[in-house]
Amino acid sequence: MKNKFNFKIFTGNLAIIIYIALATTICHLIISENYGYFLDEMYTMACSQHLSLGFVDIPPVAPALLWLITTLFGNSLFVIHLLPALFSGAAVVVVGLMVKELGGGRLAMGLAALAAAFVPVWMAVGSLYTYDFLDQFIIMLLFYFLIKLIKSENNKLWLAIGAIAGIGLMTKPSMIFFIAGLALAVLVTKHRKMYATRWPWMGAGIALIIILPALIWQMGNGFPIVEYWGAYSAGKAVHASAVEFVLMQVVGMNVFLLPLWLMGLYYVLFDKEGKKYRLLGVTFAILFFVFLVTGAKMYMLIPAYAMLLAGGAIFVERFASKIIKKMLIAVYACLIMITGVIQAPNFMPILPVDSLVQYYDTIGGLFGTKSIRLDNNTQVELPQYFYDRLEWDVLVDDVTEVYNSLSGEERADTAIVTQNYGWAGAIDLFGADKGLPKATCGQLNYYFFSMEHIGRKTWITIGESQEEMQKVFDSVTAAKISRTVYRKPGETLILICRGPKFTVDEALQAIKKFE
C-alpha cells in the first residue's frame, strides 16, 4: 500500500490559519535586518551570556532562548529576530485554534487569524527580541488551554495551565496578574466547583515548582524584583487616565477590530451558545478593571483580546449564510487588511528612517499621536521602540576614540561605566571588536554580572554629570559629546574620571540602580 502525503493541512479548514501565519512570519523576517539592535535586545543578549535563575527584571526564559539560538547561529539581526517572527506566526495559529475549539468554521478561523495578524501591538512585539513576544504568546496559549478545559470538562488540563503559568512567570513577572485574574474569575463563576478537585491545586503546584529556584534566589537577595517594579510603577511608566487607557486599547488593537472584539466579549458573556465560556469574559473584565485602575501599560492586556477575537469571529460567521452577508464580511476583512498595512510602519521597521519621520507627519497622525509619550515628562519625534534601534555605532565609536586617547598603561586600568543598560549593552555588543573592555553598569541585571572592573582607577563614564563626578574623583575631564540625530537624548557626555575618592564597597552601593 502506497503512502500518500496528506494535503489536508493545505486545503482543509486549518489551511487559512497556516497561510496567514506563514505570511506573518515571512513579513517579519523580510524586515528583520532593518534599522539596528534595540536597546532591550542588547541588554537581553548581555543577560544571555550570564544565565542565572536570579533576576531583577528579566527572568531567565528569554535570555536562555536567546543564548541557545545565538550559540547555534550567531547574533546577526536576522537570527535575533527569528524567534519573534516565528512566535508571531504561532500566535496567529493559536487564535485560529481558539476558534476551532469554540466551534467555529473556516470563515471564522480565517477572520480571527487575519485580525490577529494585524493587531498593532502584536506587529510591534514580533519585530523585537524582548520578553514581550514570549509573554504575549504564552498568555494566549494559557487562554487556549482554558477554552479546552471548559469545553472538555477535563480537569487534568489544569496541569498544562499550571505549567504554562509557571513558564510565563519565568518569562515576565506580569503573568501574575493573569493568574490572579483567572483564579478570581473561577471563584465568582459556576466553575468554582473546580476548586473542590485536586487538579487546580496540582496545577498551582507545578507552577510553584517551576518558579521555586528563582523565588529562593529572590528571598536570598532581598527581592530586587519588588524594588524594580515599585520604581517602575512610581516613575517610569506612563500613568494613563481611564479615558486614555480605553482609547489606547482601541488603538493598540486596531480601531477596525473594535466591533469584532466587542462582539466576542458579548459572545462569551451573554450569547446562548457562547456563555458556556463565560469564565473567559469574566476573566477579561477583571483584568480590564485592574489594569484600568492601576494605569498599566496599554499593551499588558492585549493578549487577553485573542479569545475575544475568536468569539467575535464565530459571532460574525453565524450571520454569514447569505451571499450578501458574506460580501459584507469580505469588505470588513479588506478594511482590516488595509488599515493594518497603513498602520504597519507605525509599529514595524518598514520605512527608511527619513521616510518614517515623514510618515509620522502625515499618515501616522491618523492612528495615534505624532509625539509618542514615553515617560512622565518626555516628548519625542519617533517612538522609543524605533529610535532606540538607531545610531548605537556612533556612541561606541565616540567611546572608542576617548578610550584610545589614553596611554596603554592607563587603558589597562580603565573601566567604562554607565548606569544605562542600553549604553552598556551597546559597548558589550560592538565594543569587543574595537578593543573596549566590557561595560560596568549598575542598572538591573547588569549589577550582578558587570562589576569586574569597578575597582579600576580610571573611569570613562557615559551620560554622567560632570559636577557629580567631580565630587567623587580627583580629576574629571569632559572628553567628548556624542551626538545623534534620532536617538535620544541627542547629546551624551563622555567623561574621563581619575583618582576615585571611594572604596569598591562604596562604589558597589552607589552604582546599584534597580529601576
Q: Where are the regions that the model predicts?
A:
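Signature aromatic-anchored transmembrane alpha helix within multi-pass, membrane-resident enzymes
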Residues: R318-Q358
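Short acidic/glycine- and proline-prone juxtamembrane loop motifs at membrane-interface regions
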Residues: V121-D135
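Transmembrane-lumen/periplasm boundary regions of multi-pass, lipid-linked membrane glycan transferases
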Residues: I176-Y277, V341-P349
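Extracytoplasmic catalytic/substrate-binding loops of multi-pass membrane glycan-assembly enzymes
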Residues: I31-T44, G54-L66, G74-F78
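Transmembrane-helix motifs of polytopic, lipid-linked glycan transferases
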Residues: I18, L82-G103, L141, F145
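Membrane-interface transmembrane helices that cradle and orient dolichyl/undecaprenyl
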Residues: K100-G103, L142-L157, L265-G274
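Short hydrophobic alpha-helices at membrane interfaces in multi-pass membrane enzymes
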Residues: L107, F145-G166, T197, W201, ...
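Short helix- or helix-capping micro-motifs
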Residues: A21, A112-P120, A165, L169, ...
